[in-house]
């Protein structure tokens, strides 16, 4: 049976008229604190700066299955959206009480709750400010202004990505130099294009490391050879060449604000793109990462050599 992730998100209207958001998602470089605040701000018609985010704290945060499996923006984002929608409705209910009318007769613009004028007159003629609502919420009030929403999804629509790489390959040494990497990503609607772009660039760097450098080998006694970063090679900024990222947007109806995930797809394209580029340069396919200079040289010397393991003896 497939295990579904379960995410909770809590939002609270503070007594000064700003918002506190409590999340269990850990920001591991994805920018989830910023993105989730943007989503809540969109629903509540406020600035992201008006939302104070309290990150993962196992003593206080609502439950979160974990920041993995490309789930934060897509699943935690939906919990955030639902919590913000519920809080918005509760703010309208308190505002309607102060205005002496039904909740169906008012709306909220982020700064005040106002009576909707069906005749098209000035909507702001009769209103109550958010700060007054925040004060009212603390005294003689039974409508909660701190809400928690839970979300779980049986599906996770896949993102798509195209990766294209230009390399320079030295046939004397087998060394590969990346000159240019072009990426086009469909992750739905990017909530924060800048964060999505740098996450894509970081994922491409990880994928290049997996494809060309990173490897773990053991000797016959089971001792690991790459036991520090002098032996375990990872790419630096100088090793990944020029990276250009573009987005092809699409709207995903099951995600919050049309988003899809982006976390893992960006790591997947460098290895096959580099394998194809090496094939175009040498005429030999390599199907086992990393594509080290030793493997490339052995492949050029013997086209029938099918990825013999270069293990430490």
What are these regions (language model features)?
Residues 26:
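Gly/Ser-rich, acidic/histidine-flanked active-site/gating loops
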Residues 11-12:
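Extended lipid/amphipathic-ligand handling interfaces
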Residues 15-16, 110:
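Residue-level signal for tight coil/turn positions that link beta-strands
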């Amino acid at each position: 049976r497939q295990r579904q992730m379960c995410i909770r998100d809590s939002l609270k209207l503070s007594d000064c008229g700003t918002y506190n958001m409590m999340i269990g998602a850990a920001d591991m470089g994805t920018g989830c604190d910023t993105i989730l605040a943007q989503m809540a701000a969109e629903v509540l018609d406020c600035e992201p700066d008006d939302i104070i985010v309290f990150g993962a704290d196992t003593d206080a945060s609502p439950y979160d299955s974990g920041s993995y499996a490309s789930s934060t923006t897509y699943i935690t984002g939906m919990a955030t959206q639902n919590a913000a929608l519920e809080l918005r409705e509760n703010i309208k209910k308190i505002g309607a009480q102060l205005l002496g009318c039904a909740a169906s007769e008012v709306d909220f613009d982020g700064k005040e709750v106002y009576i909707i004028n069906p005749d098209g007159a000035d909507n702001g003629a009769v209103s109550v400010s958010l700060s007054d609502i925040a004060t009212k919420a603390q005294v003689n009030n039974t409508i909660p202004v701190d809400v928690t929403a839970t979300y779980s999804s049986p599906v996770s629509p896949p993102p798509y990505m195209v990766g294209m790489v230009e390399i320079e390959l030295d046939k004397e040494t087998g060394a590969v130099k990346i000159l240019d990497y072009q990426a086009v990503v469909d992750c739905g609607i990017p909530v924060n294009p800048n964060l999505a772009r740098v996450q894509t660039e970081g994922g491409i760097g990880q994928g290049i490391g997996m494809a060309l450098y990173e490897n773990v080998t053991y000797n016959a006694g089971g001792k690991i050879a790459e036991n520090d970063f002098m032996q375990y090679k990872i790419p630096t900024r100088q090793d990944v060449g020029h990276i250009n990222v573009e987005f092809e947007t699409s709207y995903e109806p099951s995600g919050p604000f049309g988003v899809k995930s982006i976390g893992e797809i960006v790591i997947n394209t460098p290895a096959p793109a580099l394998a194809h580029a090496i094939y175009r340069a040498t005429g030999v396919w390599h199907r086992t990462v990393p594509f080290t200079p030793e493997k490339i040289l052995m492949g050029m010397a013997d086209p029938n050599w099918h990825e013999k393991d270069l293990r430490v003896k």
